[in-house]
Design a protein with these regions (language model features):
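Cell-envelope/extracellular polymer assembly enzymes that use nucleotide-activated donors
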Residues: 9-11, 42
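Donor nucleotide-sugar binding loop of glycosyltransferases
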Residues: 19-22, 50, 78
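Short, well-formed alpha-helical segments that are part of the catalytic scaffolds
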Residues: 19-33
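Acidic helix N-cap motif at the loop->helix transition within catalytic regions
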Residues: 22-25, 52-60
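A short, amphipathic alpha-helix embedded in the catalytic core of nucleotide-handling enzymes
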Residues: 30, 106-111
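Conserved donor nucleotide-binding strand/loop of the catalytic core
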Residues: 41-44, 55-88
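A conserved acidic beta->alpha catalytic loop
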Residues: 47-55, 101
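Short aromatic/hydrophobic "clamp" motif used to bind/position activated sugar donors
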Residues: 94
């Protein structure tokens, strides 16, 4: 896709592991940015064997928002979490970042 192309949809892949302290605020911010676009989107949360309350918080997002899809794993493996997320994407345009390092300005620029 060249820089002059437009797109009708996108997927965001976010691997997570023990992120209960930042997950709710971060996903709400990401959803808010995405919902301001006129483009269909999905957010793939690839849970990575968390031992805290991350998995339950992610399930709540999936249940309350049709644009959020949760993939669960019982063991931590960052590479596998990314791979599972990419394989689940239904859209051609894919954005991926870590929940604790994402940038709102980067996401807005991508969209």
């Amino acid at each position: 896709m060249d820089s002059n192309s437009s797109f009708n949809n996108f997927s965001i892949v976010i691997p997570i592991y023990n992120e209960e302290d930042i997950l709710t605020e971060s996903i709400n911010n990401i959803l808010s940015i995405c919902e301001r676009t006129s483009v269909d989107f999905e957010i793939i949360i690839s849970e990575n064997g968390s031992t805290d309350n991350t998995k339950n918080l992610a399930r709540e997002f999936e249940q309350s928002n049709p644009n959020v899809i949760l993939i669960e794993s019982d063991y931590p493996n960052y590479g596998e979490a990314l791979k599972r997320g990419f394989l689940k994407c239904k859209n051609e345009m894919i954005i991926s970042f870590d929940i604790d390092y994402y940038s709102e300005s980067f996401l807005k620029e991508c969209l």
